[in-house]
């Protein structure tokens, strides 16, 4: 008989929900940088583990911060 493999990928925890963050402020650059790649792109949910609701809030906050000049649109090489 074939043995079944145990274990697998562990589900990622939503950082925003785990830390009870109600409002994602576009001025909180340190928080937003956690969800941006080295190139300045917004990381997807499957990488960060955020819920769909919090991912939408994050996206809006990151885009606002970019327009205000707090975050770069692209990273410098």
UniProtKB/Swiss-Prot annotation:
GO terms for biological process: translation. The keyword Ribonucleoprotein applies. Disulfide bonds: none annotated. One of its GO terms (molecular function) is small ribosomal subunit rRNA binding. The keyword Repressor does not apply. One of its GO terms (cellular component) is cytosolic small ribosomal subunit. Keywords: Ribonucleoprotein, Ribosomal protein, RNA-binding, rRNA-binding. Belongs to the bacterial ribosomal protein bS18 family. Part of the 30S ribosomal subunit. Forms a tight heterodimer with protein bS6. Binds as a heterodimer with protein bS6 to the central domain of the 16S rRNA, where it helps stabilize the platform of the 30S subunit. This is Small ribosomal subunit protein bS18. It comes from Lactobacillus gasseri (strain ATCC 33323 / DSM 20243 / BCRC 14619 / CIP 102991 / JCM 1131 / KCTC 3163 / NCIMB 11718 / NCTC 13722 / AM63). The lineage of its organism: Bacteria, Bacillati, Bacillota, Bacilli, Lactobacillales.
């Amino acid at each position: 008989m074939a043995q079944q493999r145990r274990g697998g990928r562990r589900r990622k925890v939503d950082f925003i929900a785990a830390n009870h963050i109600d409002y994602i402020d576009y001025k909180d650059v340190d928080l937003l940088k956690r969800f941006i790649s080295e190139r300045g792109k917004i990381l997807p949910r499957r990488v960060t583990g955020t819920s769909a609701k919090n991912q939408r809030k994050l996206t809006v906050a990151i885009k606002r911060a970019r327009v205000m000049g707090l975050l770069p649109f692209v990273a410098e090489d």
